[in-house]
């Protein structure tokens, strides 16, 4: 029930291992073969991404995948199959290693902080206004 509150909520939203984890999954399994579980999880992920695109970003023309999913050819092909009108690739096609995106995002936030520039996008985060993010604690 908790996962439904997260999945069907309007953006901004986020979740991770605090909700979707091995104990959560094991509680729902009834002897299914590991390969069937993996395939189901790929389909579930691709379908939730597709639903989010259709509901909240129907105007996009490209989907650039990063993180662990970018290494999964089945995930990429499933996303492409479910989104035939989109160019579905990884951020590698932009010259950015899919595993580096999070680190680069934090570097960008640090750069913005150092220049005393705002680092959030209220329309994406739900914040009440633009803010300078972070703090500096000299040693």
Protein language model regions, located:
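Short, small-residue-biased leader/transition segments that mark boundaries at the very start
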Residues: 1-7
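Adenine-nucleotide phosphate-binding core of ATP-dependent small-molecule kinases
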Residues: 10-11, 15-54
């Amino acid at each position: 029930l908790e996962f439904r509150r997260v999945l069907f909520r309007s953006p901004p939203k986020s979740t991770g291992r605090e909700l979707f984890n091995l104990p959560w999954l094991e509680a729902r399994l009834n002897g299914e073969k590991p390969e069937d579980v993996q395939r189901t999880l790929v389909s579930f992920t691709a379908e939730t991404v597709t639903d989010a695109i259709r509901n909240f970003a129907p105007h996009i023309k490209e989907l650039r995948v990063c993180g662990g999913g970018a290494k999964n050819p089945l995930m990429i092909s499933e996303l492409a199959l479910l989104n035939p009108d989109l160019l579905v690739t990884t951020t590698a096609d932009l010259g950015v290693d899919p595993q580096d995106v999070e680190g680069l995002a934090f570097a960008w936030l640090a750069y913005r902080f150092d220049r005393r520039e705002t680092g959030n996008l209220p329309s994406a985060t739900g914040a009440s206004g633009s803010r300078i993010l972070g703090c500096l604690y000299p040693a």
